[in-house]
Amino acid sequence: MTEYKLVVVGAGGVGKSALTIQLIQNHFVDEYDPTIEDSYRKQVVIDGETCLLDILDTAGQEEYSAMRDQYMRTGEGFLCVFAINNSKSFADINLYREQIKRVKDSDDVPMVLVGNKCDLPTRTVDTKQAHELAKSYGIPFIETSAKTRQGVEDAFYTLVREIRQYRMKKLNSSDDGTQGCLGLSCAVM
């Protein structure tokens, strides 16, 4: 069974834990209890493949930012979550993305941009803005509601598909013999 290490990142209060718990337990948590770090595992079938999702739900609070490098190092794919009623959380996405790219030492990291709380009547982040940001990053954008479950599976499953594509790309690039050699000739001594 293939395992996928997913990491849910974003500012405090955007609904990272609510999204994760909705996926894992089919239940909406409406009280806010800031997360330090929680890990969940769930077996699912995505596109006919049985997968084990290893999901790390992270702290959004700034005081836990020192822990970020560690989980960013081990994660394979990232759900970058903002709340559609919180412009600051949307602006913060770029900070998370840049930190992920720095820690992974790569511009090509599987990610999905997630606009949560789409069940709310008022929004400060326009869908068009979010689509444009995702397009500029070259990643998918999905609106979700942890409360109604709208888009929850779609967000996590899309991330798994992004990781699959990334793995295939890495596999194909290593077939040309240049992997690890930076295109130079290698010799075993």
UniProtKB/Swiss-Prot annotation:
GO terms for cellular component: Golgi membrane; plasma membrane. There is a cross-link at K170 (Glycyl lysine isopeptide (Lys-Gly) (interchain with G-Cter in ubiquitin)). It holds the Pfam family Ras. Residues 166-185 are annotated as: Hypervariable region. Alternates between an inactive form bound to GDP and an active form bound to GTP. Activated by a guanine nucleotide-exchange factor (GEF) and inactivated by a GTPase-activating protein (GAP). Transmembrane segments: none annotated. The modification Phosphoserine is found at S89. A lipid is attached at C181 (S-palmitoyl cysteine). The keyword Lyase does not apply. GO terms for molecular function: G protein activity; GDP binding; GTP binding; GTPase activity. The keyword Isomerase does not apply. One of its GO terms (biological process) is Ras protein signal transduction. It is a lipid-anchor. A motif (Effector region) lies at residues 32-40. Palmitoylated by the ZDHHC9-GOLGA7 complex. Depalmitoylated by ABHD17A, ABHD17B and ABHD17C. A continuous cycle of de- and re-palmitoylation regulates rapid exchange between plasma membrane and Golgi. Keywords: Acetylation, Cell membrane, Golgi apparatus, GTP-binding, Hydrolase, Isopeptide bond, Lipoprotein, Membrane, Methylation, Nucleotide-binding, Palmitate, Phosphoprotein, Prenylation, Proto-oncogene, Ubl conjugation. Residues 187-189 form a propeptide. GTP binds at residues 10-18, 29-30, 57-61, 116-119. It catalyses: GTP + H2O = GDP + phosphate + H(+). It is found in: Cell membrane; Golgi apparatus membrane. Its main location: membrane. PANTHER family: RAS, DI-RAS, AND RHEB FAMILY MEMBERS OF SMALL GTPASE SUPERFAMILY (PTHR24070). Interacts (active GTP-bound form preferentially) with RGS14. Interacts (active GTP-bound form) with RASSF7. Interacts (active GTP-bound form) with both SHOC2 and PP1c (all isoforms) to form a tertiary complex; SHOC2 and PP1c preferably bind M-Ras/MRAS, but they also bind K-Ras/KRAS, N-Ras/NRAS and H-Ras/HRAS. Belongs to the small GTPase superfamily. Ras family. Ras proteins bind GDP/GTP and possess intrinsic GTPase activity. This is GTPase NRas. It comes from Monodelphis domestica.
